[in-house]
Regions:
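Anionic-ligand anchoring segments at beta-strand to alpha-helix junctions in alpha/beta enzyme folds, i.e.
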Residues: 18, 26-76, 175-221, 263-266, ...
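A cross-family phosphate/adenosyl-ligand binding-site feature
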Residues: 1-10, 124-136, 254-258, 278-279
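An N-terminal, well-structured beta->alpha segment
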Residues: 1-31
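Phosphate-moiety recognition in structured ligand-binding domains
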Residues: 1, 117, 231-232, 239-291
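Glycine-rich phosphate-binding loops that contact phosphosugars or nucleotide phosphates
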Residues: 29-157, 163-164, 182, 225-251
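A general structural motif
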Residues: 157-166, 204-214, 230-231
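YjeF_N-associated NAD(P)HX repair module
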Residues: 7-10, 18-19, 135-176, 270-291
């Protein structure tokens, strides 16, 4: 996992270059789009959907593949699937065949998704051995950001900074973690929380930042770390610090902040004697038996 974490600046650069050559496999401006996935891929889809709508390129929804609204019309459905074998994704693509244009973004084209989708974008250079996703997720989102014209070299530089700088002091010792986001970074907050749960078995939550005051702040204690992706709502940092919790304000590109959160998940796992590459009860892909 450490090697995969460290390679993200390079895989982001390659993905951004790849975006220009895959214009037909990715949504055109004005298309009504849904993006689907499971776990990490769903959360990257949430971030992309918000980014695409904010940039004025068309209505975009994100769904867990198992919760796709079958009767809702779209011009294109994008499936994010690292393995290309996830049952819910393949079943949905099969259901949609001939009804709507589908695109899949995957790390392995030698899998059933190659035949299941109409168009394919392969990020094999971002594939991973670890069960826990890190670089494939951020590389796929970089591809999509670049296709929207929103990728910058500063994001890559910030990723290098996120890998090089020490984590905030005393963060590893916290007993509870909360990640907050606004707009497209809500998806990143959800993903950061999932990384902490998977890799370090930590009690971790995620919310839209403005929702934190509406109940969740009640569990905040001196053992809590509250981490904000992007600009915080006015007064929230002070309110969180007032509970005794540790506040972490993101200063880097939000996707680079996710890299910092990935590092935190590994550090907490190491401190607890856990193997972050092979979390309990998890496999690299969820393949369900046929009905």
């Amino acid at each position: 996992m450490q090697t995969e974490l460290a390679s993200q600046p390079e895989t982001w650069t390659r993905a951004a270059q790849l975006a220009a050559g895959n214009s037909t496999a990715l949504p055109a401006a004005g298309e009504r789009v849904a993006i689907v996935g499971c776990g990490t891929s769903w959360f990257m889809g949430q971030a992309y959907a918000a980014l695409r709508e904010q940039s004025g390129q068309g209505e975009t929804d994100a769904f867990a593949a198992s919760e796709f609204p079958a009767g809702r019309p779209y011009d294109r459905v994008i499936a994010l699937t690292r393995s290309g074998t996830t049952t819910e994704v393949l079943e949905l693509l099969g259901h949609l065949r001939g009804r709507v244009r589908t695109s899949a973004i995957t790390a392995d084209p030698r899998t059933p998704v190659m035949e299941a989708a109409d168009d394919l974008v392969v990020l094999d250079f971002a594939d991973e051995r670890s069960v826990v996703q890190t670089r494939f997720a951020t590389t796929a989102l970089t591809l999509l950001r670049a296709h929207l014209g929103l990728h910058t070299e500063e994001a890559v530089a910030d990723a290098r900074t996120a890998l090089a700088e020490p984590l905030p002091e005393n963060l590893v010792a916290c007993s509870q973690f909360t990640f907050l986001g606004r707009g497209w970074t809500v998806g990143l907050a959800n993903e950061a929380a999932l990384k902490m749960r998977e890799a370090s078995l930590s009690w971790t939550e995620a919310y839209p930042a403005m929702e934190y005051r509406h109940g969740p702040i009640s569990v905040t204690t001196s053992g809590t770390a509250t981490w904000m992706f992007g600009q915080a709502p006015e007064g929230l940092a002070e309110q969180v610090r007032g509970t005794g919790a540790q506040w972490v304000g993101g200063t880097l590109d939000p996707l680079a902040e996710l890299v910092r959160a990935q590092r935190l998940a590994v550090a907490v796992a190491d401190a607890r004697g856990l193997d972050p590459d092979s979390p309990r009860h998890l496999t690299r892909s969820v393949i369900l038996p046929s009905a």
